[in-house]
């Protein structure tokens, strides 16, 4: 039925965007995996896909869960998503110290894109989950420092994943991470201020180490002319662990070369949120980029906050979830988007006992959007929940090259 609808819309010149549950059951391992898939398929140009793969049987061993996900992903590429390439993967693990090396060994033959591996335990009781961002109609290559380039339409999209070092403090690690990234961008004739669109900072023991991340980021950003008078970068700063206990901060990032500065817009939602610099941090609430044929939206990690920077509904997970949705919805609306344009949701919870309530709420409101629920305390202890997302919407703008 979906294929028939797609063909009919294609004849009318309408881009197809939809999300649905795709369960592949080819062998005994694949039957333990569920796949939620979002498709953005314009009649011309690059198609975009978000896939969220999760295990349905938590009793499987870790090796069996990995095998099941890999088999289902391979089958997905050979069937539903034939002809696509992955541009970014993030693996969510329950115990990175005991799991990451095994997973990396399986990826040697599948190192086809930027690869992020982080300990953020799936809250459904399984050991591993996978988010994949895929595209069709692009050229890809690995850059000298391991970053991953996706090119098409006169743009170069640079994905960087699993960056870390082992300096003695979170502040020093963050400063080294950012300075190294700035140098890598310079090799691609890019800058942090003009080209970096999105960052993720995963912080071990976030209640203790996040302050060092904030201090270093503020100081480095100042040297790059990223201030309250210019702009910052959309970001998530959340709990997450590397396999090594000595790694206090891990960073992923996304940059685009070839943009005009007029294509980049920042989201504020001042009726609901305040500028982050007012409480001492430096990131944008969200960013959208206009191309000739589409608008891409990147919503930062967003919690239950008001426009005075205060935590809304302390201790009440239901009300915090509702306020968080309202905040994200307002940011999306500023980009002339709705949740119908969202490709995936990542939901972070501090307290695992809130999972049943939150999962029920999300499944009722967003049954088909690809999503994953993770144990990952937010940067401020009073925030019980946080979420992030990406969205895409068809537009037409003759001032810019198509995506």
Where are the predicted features?
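N-terminal presequence-like segments and the immediate start of the first folded domain
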Residues: 20, 25-343, 348-403
